Amino acid sequence: FAGQAIWDDKKMCLPFGGYWHMLHYRTDLFEAEGLEAPKTFDDVLAAAKLFKDNPKYPELEGGYAMNMARGSAAGQQFYEWIYSAGGKPWESNYPGSPDAYADQRGLYNSAESVAFIEWMQEMINYMPPGVEQYAWDERAKAFTQGKVAMINNWSVRTPLFNDPEISKVKGKFGVALFPHAAGAESVPPVGGWIACVNKHTKNKEAAWDYLKWFASPEIHREW
């Protein structure tokens, strides 16, 4: 993650807010059904089928929620999942490797990509109505309100699921490693933010002072 702020061996930006992607699942529901945390795509699909339209859980609108809105929301899902599907989006290796982005010929028609898209198409049947409009906020909101049994989400959202003022699932969920396809390994996405000072700004020192303050341990922990 920190390496993304370096160009030509020079640190160009200030990394902050490193996050990772995890499976969030309702431990109370899984325990009631005698299930363990899903590990594979097949596990996620089977659990989603079980919880969708299950009369024992009328509050659930779906077994799983995913970003499905057109554009960057659905697009990010592909990039988040394709490595754990045993594939990759382009010829170059994983971001952070020496040849990352060197060859961006798309691999969207690869066997792994096609299998993942077909899995997504099957999963839609077990998601809430209107999931085609879901992006990051809608996905998290569905889980926070207890409307789905599972989501994959960035760790920055996890504390909100335990906030009693907004969450109906406080103390009722767990996290697990990013699911993977059969025969593949889990490759959890890691992300975050980088902050820079534009060289054309009129207030470079003030901007730098702000970044140092914002990235300080006490402020960043609160943020």
Q: Where in the sequence are the language-model features?
A:
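Short helix-loop capping/hinge motifs at secondary-structure junctions, enriched
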Residues: 28-38, 88-90, 125-126, 200-207
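Glycine-centered hinge/linker elements that transmit conformational signals in sensory
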Residues: 48-50, 92-133, 178
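Short helix-initiation/N-cap motifs at beta->coil->alpha
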Residues: 41-46, 131-145
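C-terminal lobe and pocket-closing loops
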Residues: 156-170, 181-223
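Hinge/lid segment of periplasmic solute-binding proteins
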Residues: 1-21, 45, 74-86, 170-177
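Short glycine- and hydrophobic/aromatic-rich loop-to-beta-strand nucleating segment
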Residues: 21-25, 82, 195-197
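A local structural motif
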Residues: 10, 33-37, 121-135, 147, ...
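Paired acidic/hydrophobic, glycine-rich loop segments that form the ligand-binding mouth/hinge
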Residues: 149-154
